[in-house]
Amino acid sequence: MIKLVLLVAAIAIFGTGFITVIINQFTSAKNIIMDLYNSDTWLIWLFGRMAVLFSHPLMLTISSLYIVGFIVSKTLYS
């Protein structure tokens, strides 16, 4: 029971930060995509822009959320 309370508290504390970071990164990713569409020579810049998009912190955040979810599920169901 105590472990569950600590887990919920940790998720609440880190969750608010995660949500803010994810919103900022979605906005940044959206700006990159909009730049792609608004560019006249977008075929020339496509590979450079896609490289920026795929090295985007959003990808890192998604993978770290999977890791956090895995740890949480292991803690709850062990």
Swiss-Prot record:
Top-level taxonomic group: Viruses
Chief location: virion
Cellular-component GO terms for this entry: helical viral capsid; host cell membrane; membrane
UniProt signal peptide: 1-29
Regions crossing the membrane: 52-72
Subunit: Homomultimerizes.
Biological function: May self assemble to form a helical capsid wrapping up the viral genomic DNA. The virion assembly and budding take place at the host inner membrane.
The protein's name: Putative capsid protein ORF9
Source organism of the structure: Spiroplasma virus SpV1-R8A2 B (SpV1)
